[in-house]
C-alpha cells in the first residue's frame, strides 16, 4: 500500500514538474530545433562541411583536423 502511494505521488510530481518546466507551446514547432535552423541559414557553420586530413598531411597540434590522430604535426 505504501509503495502504491509513493508511486502515485512520484508520477504526480513528475507530471507537475514536466508542465512547470515546459516551454511555451504557442510557438509550435518554430523553435523545436533552433541550432539546426541556424545552421540551415548559414551552411558554412555546419561541421559536416569540414574535411578531415588524410594520413601524412600536415596538421595543427592545437586544433587537429585529421581523420585519425595528429602525431608530431603529421596525420597518422
Curated annotation (Swiss-Prot):
Signal peptide start and end residues: 1-22
Disulfide topology: 52-67, 59-70, 66-75
CC per GO annotation: extracellular region; host cell presynaptic membrane
Any one GO MF annotation of this record: ion channel inhibitor activity
Subcellular location: Secreted
Pfam families named in the record: Conotoxin
Annotated tissue distribution: Expressed by the venom duct.
Propeptide position ranges: 23-50
Keywords associated with the record: Calcium channel impairing toxin, Disulfide bond, Ion channel impairing toxin, Knottin, Neurotoxin, Presynaptic neurotoxin, Secreted, Signal, Toxin, Voltage-gated calcium channel impairing toxin
Domain of life per record: Eukaryota
InterPro entries noted in UniProt: Conotoxin
Main location: secreted
Entry text on domains: The presence of a 'disulfide through disulfide knot' structurally defines this protein as a knottin. The cysteine framework is VI/VII (C-C-CC-C-C).
Protein role: Omega-conotoxins act at presynaptic membranes, they bind and block voltage-gated calcium channels (Cav).
Family, similarity comment: Belongs to the conotoxin O1 superfamily.
Name under which the protein is recorded: Omega-conotoxin-like TxMKLT1-0141
Gene source species: Conus textile (Cloth-of-gold cone)
Amino acid at each position: 500500500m505504501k509503495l502504491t502511494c509513493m508511486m502515485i505521488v512520484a508520477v504526480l510530481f513528475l507530471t507537475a514538474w514536466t508542465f512547470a518546466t515546459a516551454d511555451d507551446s504557442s510557438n509550435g514547432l518554430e523553435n523545436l530545433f533552433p541550432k539546426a535552423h541556424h545552421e540551415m541559414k548559414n551552411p558554412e557553420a555546419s561541421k559536416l562541411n569540414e574535411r578531415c586530413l588524410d594520413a601524412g598531411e600536415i596538421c595543427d597540434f592545437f586544433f587537429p583536423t585529421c581523420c585519425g590522430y595528429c602525431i608530431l604535426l603529421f596525420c597518422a
